[in-house]
Amino acid sequence: MSSDEEDFNDIYGDDKPTTTEEVKKEEEQNKAGSGTSQLDQLAALQALSSSLNKLNNPNSNNSSSNNSNQDTSSSKQDGTANDKEGSNEDTKNEKKQESATSANANANASSAGPSGLPWEQLQQTMSQFQQPSSQSPPQQQVTQTKEERSKADLSKESCKMFIGGLNWDTTEDNLREYFGKYGTVTDLKIMKDPATGRSRGFGFLSFEKPSSVDEVVKTQHILDGKVIDPKRAIPRDEQDKTGKIFVGGIGPDVRPKEFEEFFSQWGTIIDAQLMLDKDTGQSRGFGFVTYDSADAVDRVCQNKFIDFKDRKIEIKRAEPRHMQQKSSNNGGNNGGNNMNRRGGNFGNQGDFNQMYQNPMMGGYNPMMNPQAMTDYYQKMQEYYQQMQKQTGMDYTQMYQQQMQQMAMMMPGFAMPPNAMTLNQPQQDSNATQGSPAPSDSDNNKSNDVQTIGNTSNTDSGSPPLNLPNGPKGPSQYNDDHNSGYGYNRDRGDRDRNDRDRDYNHRSGGNHRRNGRGGRGGYNRRNNGYHPYNR
């Protein structure tokens, strides 16, 4: 590198890099837009101002640079011819560059404002500052609108309060006098029963300033010997936006103020109510906290148990009463809907409850299809047959009424064949097991349905049922003896045998008077003794 080039770089070397850096910085700032932070923008502005100051300095040094160029050109003339030609070409190029640089500097100086900065660059810089500010507010507005929608707006009734737990004898004058020490009471009303005119135990109160409401909710209040419960009045259209939790397991030494301060870390509290004993003034172990949004409730309910003053307290969501009623009703309806999804339709919820309150169903849950209904009817028949065998009573009429009721409850399902007859399933089961068909004589001796006066007999081919003995009819000695079962030594049978012996004794006496009786009608085989037949 020649000395001329070194001198040129020393004088004008910072000009080109500076201008290129300016263009690059401006392009980067235009591309970055809202993505650059304010700190980066300030740094870019400082760099821009410093570069502009450097641009102004070459204008003042143009004369000195021209003189130096003339000196260098004169020194070059002392060399060889080749050197002169090369130096002349270099000087020509340098002059061209110098003229272009000076023209740019003059243009910048002419376009500079009062402060010495170019208007175009100032406008670009200002636009860079304005773009983030113009874009950031919409994002902030979106987040703010979301929060405003999720939070309850209490500004409509910020001066109104709900007063609960009032004494029956508390009047509006007493209530106004008590709360008048917290501020000017503008409106007050105690709700009364329209029929009796007696107080319903709660009312509403309005102050002139919201600060009075803030003072009231900080402390506990006792009026006419009873602890009252003043709360902020929440508009009906804002109640769904609020969230309430139940807190249990609170220590007896916890005070209302520290209770509220502890739960304020999860959100803005509308009302914090720690239940206190009116006699001792200590905590009763539970309380309620109302937040201005449901998001705060979600945050505090992430853990079921929280440490508070060296104790584990329990956190639950507190639902309003009308929501609890809806959930209970939905639970009952879901039960009916589940049965409907299985293929059946009970018509309404009342029929569903009526069917499951029937003791004959015994927890049996039928599937609503023909095969399941057939199995259900068969199960009902077996149940009534078992009851007949245990009690000795005829349940045919009761069974038919039950079947008719089931037919009315489910009109869409046809009754299976022989559903109204009680004895048919048992006979069919005997036939399928291979037992012989009963004859007329067997039916006279023992039927499947036991009635009063007949003794139940079991077939030797089938295992006997382990059922309790029911009431028995009069003994038939001859039938028992012929069938091989022997004598029945039951006490009830002995009492019946005594009556039978009395009858036989009288009949035997009549035969003796006719000359054909034996021993006065007394039958030794009866093995009994009657006191009136001596």
From Swiss-Prot:
Asked whether the keyword Phosphoprotein is assigned, the reply is: yes
- Where are the Phosphoserine modifications? S2, S3, S51, S87, S206, S460, S462
Q: How is it modified after translation?
A: Methylated by HMT1. The methylation is required for nuclear export.
> CDD domains under this entry?
RRM1_Hrp1p (cd12577), RRM2_Hrp1p (cd12330)
Q: Which PROSITE patterns match?
A: RRM
Q: Where in the cell is it found?
A: Cytoplasm; Nucleus; Cytoplasm, Stress granule
Q: Which GO terms describe its biological process?
A: mRNA processing; nuclear-transcribed mRNA catabolic process, nonsense-mediated decay; response to DNA damage checkpoint signaling
Q: What is its main location?
A: cytoplasm
Sites of the modification Phosphothreonine? T458
Q: Name one Pfam family in it.
A: RRM_1
* UniProt xrefs under InterPro entries: Hrp1_RRM1 (IPR034156), Nucleotide-bd_a/b_plait_sf (IPR012677), RBD_domain_sf (IPR035979), RRM_dom (IPR000504)
> Where is this chain compositionally biased, Basic and acidic residues type?
13-30, 81-98, 145-154, 478-505
What keywords were assigned to this record? Cytoplasm, Methylation, mRNA processing, Nonsense-mediated mRNA decay, Nucleus, Phosphoprotein, Repeat, RNA-binding
Q: Where is the composition biased (Low complexity)?
A: 37-78, 99-112, 121-144, 336-354, 460-475, 523-534
The record's section on PANTHER family has:
RNA-BINDING (RRM_RBD_RNP MOTIFS) FAMILY PROTEIN, RNA-BINDING PROTEIN MUSASHI HOMOLOG RBP6
This protein's name: Nuclear polyadenylated RNA-binding protein 4
Organism of origin: Saccharomyces cerevisiae (strain ATCC 204508 / S288c)
